[in-house]
A protein has these predicted regions:
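Conserved N-terminal/central alpha/beta ligand/cofactor-binding core
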Residues: 3-7, 24-132, 142, 154-174, ...
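Beta1/beta-strand and adjacent pyrophosphate-binding region of the FAD-binding site
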Residues: 4-18
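Short hydrophobic core segments
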Residues: 13, 145-156
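An anion/pyrophosphate-binding glycine-rich loop and adjacent beta-alpha core
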Residues: 39-41, 57, 84, 184-321, ...
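A glycine-rich dinucleotide-binding beta-alpha-beta segment and adjacent secondary-structure elements
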Residues: 307-373, 401-414, 533-587, 592
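Glycine-rich phosphate/pyrophosphate-binding beta-alpha loops
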Residues: 369-377, 433-435
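Internal hydrophobic alpha-helix adjacent to the cofactor/substrate pocket in enzyme cavities
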Residues: 379-400
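Extended, charge-enriched "interface" segments that sit outside catalytic cores
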Residues: 431, 437, 448-453, 457-609, ...
């Protein structure tokens, strides 16, 4: 028999990376919040790679931290090795990636939830979500009923989860944890547009069974950089990673056994991630490629498990062992956990507003892989957005919509709710048309004032941020006012850097504009340089060297914002507008964009359609 178990302002279903950020944000904003998980030992679990960040993902982590989220700080507390990716390219694509202790990360996140005021962590499987007059009733498998004003669904890959390893398949979530077996039918009954996606993970092998003498060593950066603006010193890297390569023999084993892959045998219906394919998928898609790289990464300091990055597979376990044994350094490796594919239910994100609230279900939000994305970082970013907006709804405050011109978080959400996701969506720097101004180094400058206004950034932290901005301004003024005289020492340094000598006094800022010169090259010339946070020097140097490009991109941002302020009616029938093409009418009626800017990014809506909309909007505004 069902029994009443309590009331909450915000209920979060799932305690993965999305659920955690959602619950912590809502609770910190003053809402009575509950976070439900099937297994409390899996809070903040990292069932795939033991790392946080990476290309574009590192940007998301910095932005989450700048807003007051917890992923970056927790990753710093659990870091094993840190590397800045894409250093050989421009600053727009520099991205931090850190190896983490996955068990410690889970434990630290769980403890943060337990300590958070206004937040209850509960082990319970939610089996039913029912719409009520004042919100939603959540029913658990133990028949407890919770009355909730708002609900955030963050079920990850657990919703209807099914594991595939060769000919074997069974219902399960990742890491052998029970799936959410009943909630999917409840959500379908409610009316949510569910579909099936698929992802996978590599095997874990025993460290002592690896011959590291055969492998290329991959060290971390020294000194390692943190994700969080609150972390002052990470210390030293604690581990090394290693690199190996597949070969023709590896490839041949895959080709001989491809019919045993459930993906190629047609047993998996879900759509897989384009940018994180299984190893057998790589072989089939890139048959001319002679070899593929893999990274061997530790899962923690208190475990002998090693993660084989780039070797996701759904082939039978004995086939996995065969092809691993063809790889240099892994000839005698022992599989501790086999690789597998997992299929799961997720929702069509076109059914959502940019707040991540469902258009047809007030007070119901989605976040993370449930929304059709992939990755821990994408999930955490959406969790923060959903948690903030669920709290805003409960508190009667204005919703917070993240603009794609101001953050990768905004780009991620806008892409999902405007363009949809026909496959697991992965964040990439190429998805942002404003990436030069959305760098990871200036995430605090872009988002910390917003985090403070919302209520997630403390006054103390905000004062530190303002002080940093003041120091940055002072440093820029110093570079403008400091003149370097043409001495033999100065010109010798300039020539050594393959740049022309000076014959008269030159400002430091003008020297800095030269491609060959930066803070490091000018350290023996710049006698009055103050002791500052390295991040300040980085931001100042980038601002100087890329000033023209940045100003050009800021003008593009302003042009787009002019379209973003042109609001469109929420429940309008676009069939009433003459001149719109049929495809445009169908897409506009389905997505219901909030403004002209969002409408312009919908696939199937042409510039000509936007012109028609602008004319109609001007006429409509005059009539009103």
């Amino acid at each position: 028999m069902n029994y009443f178990a309590g009331e909450y302002d915000v209920a979060v279903v799932g305690a993965g990376h999305a659920g955690i950020e959602a619950a912590l944000a809502a609770a910190r904003l003053g809402c009575k919040t509950a976070i439900f998980t099937i297994n409390m030992d899996a809070v903040g679990n990292c069932p795939c790679n033991p790392s946080i960040g990476g290309t574009a993902k590192g940007h998301l982590v910095r932005e989450i931290d700048a807003l007051g989220g917890k992923m970056g700080k927790t990753a710093d507390e659990c870091f094993l090795q840190s590397r800045m990716l894409n250093r050989g390219k421009g600053p727009a694509v520099h991205s931090l990636r850190a190896q983490i202790d996955r068990r410690k990360y889970s434990s630290v996140m769980k403890h943060k939830i337990e300590l958070q005021k206004n937040l209850d962590l509960r082990q319970a499987e939610i089996t039913d979500i029912e719409k009520t007059e004042g919100g939603y009733n959540l029913t658990t498998r133990m028949l407890a009923v919770f009355k909730c004003k708002t609900v955030i669904i963050a079920t990850g890959t657990y919703l209807g989860g099914r594991i595939f390893v060769g000919e074997v398949s069974y219902e399960s979530g990742p890491d052998g944890i029970f799936p959410a077996a009943f909630l999917g039918s409840s959500l379908k009954k409610l009316g949510l547009p569910l579909r099936r996606f698929k992802t996978g993970t590599p095997a874990r092998v025993l460290k002592s069974s690896i011959d590291f003498s055969e492998l290329e060593v991959q060290k971390g950066d020294e000194p390692p950089q943190p994700f969080s603006y609150e972390t002052e010193n990470l210390g030293e890297n604690k581990v090394e990673c290693h690199i190996s390569w597949t070969n023709d023999e590896t490839k041949q084993i895959i080709l001989e056994n491809i019919n045993r892959s459930p993906l190629y045998a047609g047993k998996i219906e879900g759509v897989g991630p384009r940018y994180c394919p299984s190893f057998e998928d790589k072989i089939m898609r890139f048959k001319d490629k002679p070899r593929h790289q893999l990274f061997i990464e530790p899962c923690g300091l208190d475990t002998e498990e090693m993660y084989l990055q780039g070797m996701s597979s759904s082939l039978p376990e004995e086939v996995q062992l065969k092809f691993y044994h063809t790889i240099k350094g892994l000839e005698h490796c022992l599989i501790m956990r086999p690789a597998y594919a997992i299929e799961y239910d997720c929702v069509d994100p076109l059914a959502m507003n940019p707040t991540l609230e469902f258009k047809d279900f007030e007070g119901l939000f989605g976040a993370g892989q449930f929304n059709g994305s992939s990755g821990y970082e994408e999930a955490a970013a959406q969790g923060l957005v959903a948690g903030i907006n669920a709290a805003m709804k409960v508190l009667g405050r204005e919703p917070v919509i993240f603009d794609r011109s101001e953050s990768y978080i905004g780009t991620l959400v806008d892409d999902l709710v405007t363009k949809g996701a026909n496959e697991p969506y992965r964040m990439m720097t190429s998805r942002s048309e404003y990436r030069l101004v959305l760098r990871q180094d200036n995430a605090d400058e872009r988002l910390t004032p917003l985090g403070h206004r919302i209520g997630l950034i403390s006054d103390e932290r905000y004062e530190k941020f303002l002080k940093k901005q003041e120091l940055k301004k002072e440093e820029l003024n110093r570079l403008k006012s400091t003149v370097i005289s043409p001495t033999d020492e100065v010109n010798e340094i300039l020539v050594s850097r393959e740049t022309s000598e000076i014959t008269s006094g030159v400002r430091l800022i003008d020297l800095m504009k030269r491609p060959q010169l930066g803070y490091d090259a000018l350290k023996n010339i710049d006698k009055t340089r103050p002791e500052l946070d390295p991040n300040i020097f980085e931001q100042v140097e980038i601002g100087i060297k890329y000033e023209g490009y940045i100003q050009k991109q800021l003008k593009q941002v302003e042009q787009m914002k002019k379209l973003e302020v042109k609001q469109l009616p929420k429940d309008f029938d676009y069939n009433e507008i003459e001149g719109l093409r049929l495809e445009a009418r169908e897409k506009l009626n389905k997505i219901k964009p909030l403004n002209i800017g969002q409408a312009s990014r919908i696939s199937g809506v042409s510039p000509a359609d936007i012109s028609v909309l602008l004319i109609w909007l001007a006429q409509n505004n005059r009539r009103q």
